[in-house]
Curated annotation (Swiss-Prot):
Residues 1-32, 97-104, 169-191, 274-283 are extracellular. InterPro entries: GPCR_opsins, GPCR_Rhodpsn, GPCR_Rhodpsn_7TM. It comes from Mus musculus. It holds the Pfam family 7tm_1. The chain crosses the membrane at residues 33-53, 76-96, 105-125, 148-168, 192-212, 253-273, 284-304. This is Probable G-protein coupled receptor 21. Orphan receptor. Keywords: Cell membrane, G-protein coupled receptor, Glycoprotein, Membrane, Receptor, Transducer, Transmembrane, Transmembrane helix. Glycans are attached at N2, N8. Belongs to the G-protein coupled receptor 1 family. GO terms for cellular component: plasma membrane. It is found in: Cell membrane. CDD domains: 7tm_classA_rhodopsin-like. It is a multi-pass membrane protein.
Length: 349
């Protein structure tokens, strides 16, 4: 078995992107830069999301916050898992052999990303129930049922990819930065079809069906409200501003997150299907599509922070609290600092 960090067996280390190897640094420079950069972004971004959710109570009013926080924790674990290939590429010795390391890494990342995919599907179902059954929503969607659903998401995602340890085939290309995974662990067309039929296809169909109906119903509600306002305004001689469906704006935020997820994952899924069915492989394509898909773990943070006003207020409140605590800590350390008698002006969320 070849090792990616054993310099005695090869003149230079194994690199998926051969163009990124430099003799001066003796490691795969381009791969290290991409993976370490994404790892830092994913970990820092999702830590911020988790802290904001804990510090902004208004964000927890929606039941979808359960699933969004689940995605944030799963994405955070993706970032932590990416430390393994980062350290391996930098020649830090791994605690277990390379074959087991890349299998476990590929399995863990596949499970975590499928948790995000299943959570997005559950979010769309939750919003669909809120739109179609508003009167019975609180009795249908309870905190206990949400926790049970999250537990089933983790269990189901684990079971879908568990056969990869029983010689069913490779679940993805996440571990291909290790030489054993790239050269000795191959995909299987039947296992790939199994993953697509059990996870990718159902999640995509659920999302398409629910959001199509959500926006259709919201459009109908908006039209009815506009017609009623027009009749009322004509009777009273007043003009009112048209109102939109109250759930449509929040659904748009979730739809953006879902759309970006599938846009970033679509090249990976297409390549996964083509490579496992035809046997034609490309190291460059597998690396780029895989890490493009993994980059979604950071994109969720960006979309939510830019689209959700409550999240923005929570983020400002968190940053304000941190700045205030840092300022008070600095003032306490400096005995010559003149302290104000009154509390600093500011709003707390």
């Amino acid at each position: 078995m070849n090792s990616t960090w054993d310099g005695n067996q090869s003149s230079h280390p194994f690199c998926l992107l051969a163009l990124g190897y430099l003799e001066t640094v003796r490691f795969c420079l381009l791969e290290v830069l991409i993976i370490v950069f994404l790892t830092v972004l994913i970990i820092s971004g999702n830590i911020i999301v988790i802290f904001v959710f804990h510090c902004a109570p208004l964000l927890n009013h929606h039941s979808t916050s359960y699933f969004i926080q689940t995605m944030a924790y799963a994405d955070l674990l993706v970032g932590v898992s990416c430390l393994v290939p980062s350290l391996s590429l930098l020649y830090y010795p791994l605690p277990i052999e390379e074959a087991m390391t890349c299998q476990v890494f590929g399995f863990v990342v596949s499970v975590l990303k499928s948790i995000s995919m299943a959570s997005l599907a559950c979010i769309s179902i939750d919003r669909y129930i809120a739109i179609t059954k508003p009167l019975t929503y609180n009795t249908l969607v309870t905190p206990w049922r949400l926790r049970l659903c999250i537990f089933l998401i983790w269990l189901y995602s684990t079971l879908v990819f568990l056969p990869s340890f029983f010689h069913w085939g490779k679940p993805g290309y996440h571990g291909d930065v290790f030489q054993w995974c790239a050269e000795s662990w191959h995909t299987n067309s039947y296992f790939t079809l199994f993953i697509v039929m059990m996870l990718y296809a159902p999640a995509a169909l659920i999302v398409c069906f629910t959001y199509f109906n959500i926006f259709r119903i919201c459009q109908q509600h908006t039209k009815e409200i506009s017609e009623r306002q027009a009749r009322f305004s004509s009777q009273n001689g007043e003009t009112g501003e048209p109102q939109t469906c109250p759930d449509k704006r929040y659904a748009m935020v979730l739809f953006r997150i879902t759309s970006v997820f599938y846009v970033l994952w679509l090249p990976y899924i297409i390549y996964f299907l083509l490579e496992s069915s035809t046997g034609c492989s490309s190291r460059l394509a597998s690396f780029l599509t895989t890490w493009l898909a993994i980059s979604n773990s950071f994109c969720n943070c960006i979309i939510y922070s830019l689209s959700n006003s409550v999240f923005q207020r929570g983020l400002k409140g968190l940053s304000g609290s941190l700045c205030t605590s840092c300022a008070s800590h600095t003032t306490a350390k400096d005995p010559y600092t003149v302290r104000c008698k009154g509390p600093p002006n500011g709003s707390h969320i």
